[in-house]
Amino acid sequence: MVTLVLGAQFGDEGKGKITDLLSQTADLCCRSAGGHNAGHTIIHDNITYDFHILPSGLISPKCVNLIGSGTVVHVPSFFKELKALEEKGLKDANKRVFISDRAHVCFDLHSVVDGLEEASLGGRKVGTTGKGIGPCYSDKASRTGVRIGEVLDEGIVERKLRNLEAGYRRRFGDLTYDLEEEIKRFKEYRTLLKPFVVDQFTLLRKYKDASILIEGANALMLDIDHGTYPYVTSSCTGLGGTIQSLCLNPTEIKSIVGVVKAYSTRVGSGPFPSEQINEIGEKLQVTGREFGVTTGRKRRCGWLDLVMCRYSTLINHYTALNLTKLDILDDFDEIKVAVAYRLNGKEVESFPADAEELEKVEVVYETLPGWKVNTMGATKWEDLPPNAQKYIEYIEKDLGVPVRWIGTGPARSHMIERL
């Protein structure tokens, strides 16, 4: 039995909390894509945990966790994050997390190159996290990268890393990067990593009849194939990428949970049709505390975009939705939702593939009444004011997918579940 949790917008939807909730009954929790560019926060027993590369199933004491073959792993960050969790009380975390030997290694070299590539784009920067994710996936695609399993062989790592550095030096000239220092560090990591490295196929076979939870990173609109290219991440963040990365049997997928924030946010560059560059956007940013967990950057804010969510639903085939941060809308007199795009006076029939075209669309909004009632901490559907219920029902009707979970605050308990 497999359950997927996938971001339906631009990331930062709040996937961590629903993953934490579902992991309480899961035997295995897996990350399928991305690296330490991802970031989410979970509050449990008044303790705040920040996750980047590690699966958030680690908070559940009986849940085993896997970082799958489609990911890229920055080894220093892996150990730093693991240590931080242990210092906050998760003492056995290092015994419940494993890394696929087919995952790729994200070196410090990749971070240096990431910055150089962004600088070369000038005014058309992608707005990456600067963590080296793109260059690492590029090396993977060009068949020059290093896999986690190869770290256990000192000779392979040194040879491949020297080749990578030489290639980038030919491209960029001088690099502010210490090759010998990174080679030295990986000699130490060879021993430290060994207990964590597994053949994921053997592990997944062991759990074939168990409850498996897949934790998506980033979101559909940042997918390398289906997102707002080129303003995307470098991995497949949707349903297809998840199946590929973890070799899932599609017929065993029980549910696909799409996580949708009650409004829209985006970090970095790229088209954002419903963005509000005004006092509404500022209010959403301040009230919603919209700052990136990984970079600390301010998130751009706007109204919920149902055109985008329909497109996301079409690709990821959600069976249920988790609507998050409903309480952030409590103080609005009226709430708008994007229901259509117009371009050159005509309604756009399908979601534009061209980012420049998407930047030019005129958004058609539906205006719904606000509720002006505090919903933070609500745990029952009946606790919500009528207009908040109508807002949720409007989303359900438009997308054709039931909203099963509603987030009403930052704590694990701040969640409404509708059966």
Swiss-Prot record:
UniProt-annotated location(s): Cytoplasm
Top-level taxon: Eukaryota
Cofactor binding note: Binds 1 Mg(2+) ion per subunit.
Predominant location category: cytoplasm
Cofactor: Mg(2+)
Active site: residue positions: 12 (proton acceptor), 40 (proton donor)
SMART domains: Adenylsucc_synt
CDD domains referenced in this protein's UniProt entry, alphabetically: AdSS
Annotated residues for binding of substrate: 293-299
Pathway(s) it belongs to: Purine metabolism; AMP biosynthesis via de novo pathway; AMP from IMP: step 1/2
Annotated keywords: Cytoplasm, GTP-binding, Ligase, Magnesium, Metal-binding, Nucleotide-binding, Purine biosynthesis
GO cellular component: cytoplasm
Entry's Gene Ontology BP terms: 'de novo' AMP biosynthetic process; IMP metabolic process
Binding-site residues, GTP: 11-17, 39-41, 299, 325-327, 407-409
Residues the record lists as binding IMP: 12-15, 37-40, 129, 143, 218, 233, 297
Enzyme class: ligase
The protein's assembly and partners: Homodimer.
Protein family (similarity comment): Belongs to the adenylosuccinate synthetase family.
Function summary: Plays an important role in the de novo pathway and in the salvage pathway of purine nucleotide biosynthesis. Catalyzes the first committed step in the biosynthesis of AMP from IMP.
Name of the protein in question: Adenylosuccinate synthetase
